[in-house]
Amino acid sequence: LHSTSRRQRQMCIRDRDLLILVEEMRKVATNLYVTTDDGTYGFHGMGTNQLQELWDKGVRYDHCVAIGPMIMMKFVCKLTKELGIPTVVSMNPIMVDGTGMCGACRLMVGGEVKFACVDGPEFDGHQVDFDQAMKRQLQYKTEEGRAMLKLQEGDTHHGGCGQCGGEA
């Protein structure tokens, strides 16, 4: 980052406890803008709100890299598309085999099927069909929930109700 030039940087995170590399980013950024959803550090609000506010004040970006929850990346891409800022996203759908054979990480990007495990995980954010990707994520929620119950309940977990403690 430093060798290309000193530029504007924006970090957006849920809360202060999740912030990493702030001092390292300050060393390579002319200006570092930090946004936390809960206001525990820096700008209070959503990263898109701060980005729009900075844009309105004349701060310009030549590109954006968005990494995080799909819903956040969707709205970052919606805004950056309106502002004409090229945007790369790092997609993180569930990946099962890492070869593309299972299809678990299938995405639509620019109207074409792509697999995050072999074609990505970085893609042009303005080309990703986030609505479809988020719907596909939901298909694993039941299994994720059962796995979480098993982790929390240990040997007393027998099938998903989370209450019986008996045999399935």
Provide a role label for each language-model segment.
Residues L1-R9, I13:
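Single conserved hydrophobic/aromatic residue that forms the stacking wall/gate
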